[in-house]
């Protein structure tokens, strides 16, 4: 690693909440650790079970739909790669931003944002459910790796800077729908955020967040084109572009409709977009589509690097040195792509019907687990349920178990324990 980057972070950034014993299985004379602390953090995330489970969790369409599905896992790998490249350009530690990309959706339940909605409905009286807060809970508590002095799980025991890099919303719920910490995780949250500016995410988290926006805006559209749901020629249609601009202005109040209209026009006139045309799955069409996704990702990532450098200057940037700056015209282009996916994929009537069934399934599994707990819970969760002091804490354990499920397991639990109609 570049020594300049390592020197940008101090012992406070590299501190772990729990001191760990020396490794005992090393061969004599081979105990030297050659990795940086942040490289070790990345390895812990890469090898954890919660990350692997994302392979069977929905990104936009289900992980079993089509031959080349995008899942929460493949999306996280893409976010990590985009973020890592941006980190190199900005002088952040690449391993930090990479692991933040890997872990940014690690708390997502079955069925992605739709499952998040269902669990939030179930837990609304006891702190709600939010995927970002669940990320933090998994990394600091639920994923088994390190025990503290009392024998309780400290999760992966990542460094302070690593946990902060995953934290997009460094605050509790309050009256906001997006938040990063549940109430009973605040001891760990206060440790991570010690000395940090109030409610300001660190630069590494901002880079991860923009890499996430870039990845899902471009790749969700790519998937929509391949599936036949999206025809990019609509960007050149005045009425369709106006509709996208209206949707975008409602979803992103900081962007003016005129900015979004102009963004749709710019996108439609880019050769890499217009050359895709009506996608038909041929070699030429597939190459054109892949060229488009590659060039758009590069456009959006490099614009943020250049704009940030124009404000903050040269040198290695990290933590709270500066804010990530993204040009308005690029934010507008990303917003238009998001609206394409929203209008032609996520608002499809068939898709909405599937989502309603998914939420019902989650509600029914929650009732099953709650009614039969603790025997219905996994060995990792049952002791926490027994030790819980009130219904809110007990429900949180049930929520934790459901959030950990893959979609396949959730459906198996539902099928096995649901009453069957008589023939």
Curated annotation (Swiss-Prot):
Domain called HD: residue spans: 72-217
Biased composition (Basic and acidic residues): 11-22
Keywords on record: Hydrolase
NCBIfam families cross-referenced by the UniProt entry: dGTP_triPase, PRK03007.1
Cited HAMAP family: dGTPase_type2
Family: Belongs to the dGTPase family. Type 2 subfamily.
Official protein name in the record: Deoxyguanosinetriphosphate triphosphohydrolase-like protein
Origin species: Mycobacterium sp. (strain JLS)
